[in-house]
Regions:
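Bacterial Sec-dependent N-terminal signal peptides
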Residues: 1-24
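N-terminal amphipathic/hydrophobic interface segments
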Residues: 20-461
């Protein structure tokens, strides 16, 4: 029994010795000089230097080998290889016990999948992991990524970047404080101070967390998202000259989704606020079909609040509101389901023209309303004016109504099918304006403003 134990012990020692020897680095070259430095044995190897450890091979002009530490300093045209991996640097260091190489003199890595460069870097051969710092740049055939720090997991085709991160694929740019990118699946997760720029449609999305699935053409922003799209328009001045105007679309919500497919859809979900030139909206759900220049807002269930839309002095509510754009200006606006429209007079602020119906269609020219059509059980109250002098009001109802506008003022009202109309003189109306309100009349006070949106933008920037 004792003999067996002794033999087993000797065998284990021999295995351990072989394992330790297999981790020892070997350095050869044209010439070798042995030295004792501070009591430590070193070897300086010159000319056609080759360092090997297992599958790792490093060539350079000169190496200083620290024998007891199993380490070596590598000087001049350093090239490290393992399988398809190549690392280049003018000056580096190799840690045999850790199977790690390090350089602070500029590093270049190529594994036939990506190219990675930085001011300094480390590579762990036993883990197939790189850690690069300062002016980091990773690129392949479709994507370029830059950052202050980056960890690259070669076998996983995964990169984790930290600090001033930017990833660019030719059409989209993503900025973030931290970013995780999976090369094969083209999936990216971005965290903190996120900014997604689409160069194709000149739009930007800000937020604190983003998920981007490039192969699916889908992005999700679910923390403090803000969408911005700036359009350049030309306005004709009174003297016939043209001036450039910037028309910015703001959309704020709790969650945003972007689909980069044939429909080019953009979704804003929950607590949505929209602001663009002279119109604004609050709603539960907005779908923006960018290629079709169509925006649809709606409530998400039967008990939720209706979307509200403001256009200049008018306010509209309904179960859904569809905005049709042409050259980034409103062309048509449809309100469906329990529709209500009110317009405040700029000179008599307590007087509102009001219309309730099942459906409303508004038509615009150069951004100004010129016709409104109301369908389904239409009830209306319109205030009358003699010039700028108040002159009573008219209450009416019909199956459908058409209203003609000039300079945003009602000039003609046409009633169709079973019309009924009643006029109330000014002396009966003055001071009693609150008595002339249709059911469902509500003036909403939560209209988004430019100050609110720009303050939010400055906070996110």
């Amino acid at each position: 029994m004792k003999v067996k134990l002794i033999l087993m012990f000797v065998f284990l020692l021999s295995v351990l010795s072989v394992a330790q020897q297999s981790k020892l680095i070997t350095v050869i070259g044209d010439s070798l000089v042995g030295r004792m430095v501070n009591g430590e044995s070193t070897r300086e190897v010159y000319g056609n230097v080759v360092l090997t450890q297992g599958k790792v091979k490093i060539t350079c002009n000169k190496a200083i080998q620290y024998i007891s530490r199993n380490e070596a300093e590598l000087i001049g045209d350093v090239i490290a290889t393992k399988d398809t991996l190549t690392i280049k640097t003018p000056h580096g260091y190799y840690f045999g016990n850790l199977e790690k190489t390090k350089s602070t003199s500029g590093v270049y890595l190529d594994d036939k999948k990506v190219i990675l460069t930085a001011d300094s870097g480390e590579y762990y051969f036993n883990e197939d992991r790189a850690f690069f710092q300062s002016k980091v740049k990773l690129y392949d055939t479709t994507t370029t990524l830059t950052s202050n720090q980056l960890t690259y997991y070669q076998q996983q085709n995964r990169a984790v970047a930290v600090g001033d991160v930017l990833i660019f694929d030719g059409e989209n740019q993503i900025f973030a404080d931290t970013l995780e990118h999976f090369r094969n699946s083209k999936i990216t997760f971005a965290f903190s101070n996120v900014r997604l720029i689409n160069l194709k449609n000149n739009s930007e999305i800000f937020g604190q967390h983003l998920e981007d699935y490039r192969q699916k053409g889908y992005s999700l922003i679910d923390r403090e998202p803000l969408f911005i799209q700036v359009d350049t328009t030309f306005a004709t001045n009174d003297d016939g000259t043209e001036s450039v105007q910037l028309d910015t679309l703001f959309i704020k919500s709790r969650i945003m989704e972007a689909f980069r497919d044939s429909s080019e859809r953009f979704l804003a979900i929950d607590s949505v606020k929209i602001l663009k030139e002279k119109f604004a909206s609050v709603n539960d759900l907005t779908i923006f079909y960018r290629d079709e220049e169509r925006i649809v807002t709606s409530k998400i269930n039967s008990v939720s609040a209706q979307p509200v839309l403001w256009n200049e002095d008018s306010q509209l509510t309904g179960d859904s509101i569809t905005i049709y754009l042409k050259d980034n200006k409103i062309k048509q606006l449809d309100v469906d389901g329990s529709s209500f429209m009110l317009s405040q007079n700029e000179n008599y602020l307590n007087r509102y023209d009001q219309t309730s119906s099942a459906q409303i269609k508004l038509f615009f020219n150069q951004g100004k309303i010129f016709r409104a059509e109301f369908y389904g059980n239409v009830f209306s109250i319109y205030y009358m004016y003699d010039g700028e002098t108040a002159n009573g009001l008219t209450k009416s109802n019909s199956a459908s109504t058409t209203v003609i506008f000039e300079n945003n003022e009602v000039t003609e009202v046409k009633l169709y099918k079973d019309p009924a109309s009643e006029y109330y003189p000014e002396k009966q109306v003055t001071g009693n304006e609150k008595d002339y309100l249709l059911p469902r009349f509500v003036v909403h006070k939560n209209k988004p403003t430019k100050i609110e949106m720009y303050n939010l933008l400055n906070k996110l920037k």
